[in-house]
């Protein structure tokens, strides 16, 4: 019931945003998107801490490198200094491309979480579903933003996800689950950073304060 209530609140928030989008200024829309991306990153950080609490001793050694994340092929700014030099249209495109690239991986994580060999798999499963809700909410909000910004901001890079299996043994499942979550945490941080830069520009804040 709590899960349904949370999802309903999020979707109602999106509906309200859709209905009133034409009356809301760009800076307010950016602020709302930034709040959602902040929550998304906060949840992913919490999930990584949960997974760290019960991780195989050799997990860090065996876990794939960050360069193996399926979104690593996307050319993005490496830090805030670079992001501040990127246009608004490109930043919103990058944020949407990264978010879209996680639809299938989040489905996989959601299906695997309930039987994950981890003592907190119930909490992990619940948080994964929250991630899906916030991801959809943020995606809907960004769709509204690009419609307000114009056609030049609507380009999306499609990033394929080929990993449909976490493995058969307990160690492989934990490591691959943790790896995917670490990739998501990294990308959620990028999405949040890009949207905060856009919010700063929309509110005409000084770039160095973004």
From Swiss-Prot:
Database matches in Pfam families: Hormone_1
Residues annotated as signal peptide: 1-23
Origin superkingdom: Eukaryota
Gene3D superfamilies: 1.20.1250.10
Disulphide bridges: 69-183, 200-210
UniProt keyword annotations, A-Z: Disulfide bond, Hormone, Secreted, Signal
GO CC terms of this entry: extracellular space
Subcellular location: Secreted
Sample GO molecular function, one term: prolactin receptor binding
GO biological process, one term: regulation of immunoglobulin production
Homology family: Belongs to the somatotropin/prolactin family.
PANTHER family: PROLACTIN, SOMATOTROPIN,PROLACTIN
Protein name as annotated: Prolactin-2
Annotated source species: Oncorhynchus tshawytscha
């Amino acid at each position: 019931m709590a899960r349904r209530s949370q999802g309903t609140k999020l979707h109602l928030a999106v509906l309200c945003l859709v209905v009133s989008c034409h009356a809301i200024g760009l800076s307010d829309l950016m602020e709302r998107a930034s709040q959602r991306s902040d929550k998304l990153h906060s949840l992913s950080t919490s999930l990584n801490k949960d997974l760290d609490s019960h991780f195989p001793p050799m997990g860090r050694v065996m876990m794939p490198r960050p360069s193996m994340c399926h979104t690593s092929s996307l050319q993005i700014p490496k830090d805030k200094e670079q992001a501040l030099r990127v246009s608004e249209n490109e930043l919103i495109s990058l944020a949407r491309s990264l978010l879209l690239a996680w639809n299938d991986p989040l489905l996989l994580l959601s299906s695997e979480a309930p039987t994950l060999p981890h003592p907190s798999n119930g909490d992990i499963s619940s948080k994964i579903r929250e991630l899906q809700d916030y991801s959809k909410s943020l995606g809907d909000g960004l769709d509204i933003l690009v419609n307000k910004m114009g056609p030049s901001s609507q380009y999306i890079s499609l990033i394929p996800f080929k990993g449909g299996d976490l493995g058969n043994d307990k160690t492989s499942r934990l490591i691959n689950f943790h790896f995917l979550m670490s990739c998501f945490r990294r990308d959620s941080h990028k999405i949040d950073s890009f949207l905060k830069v856009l919010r700063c520009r929309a509110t005409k804040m000084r770039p160095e304060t973004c």
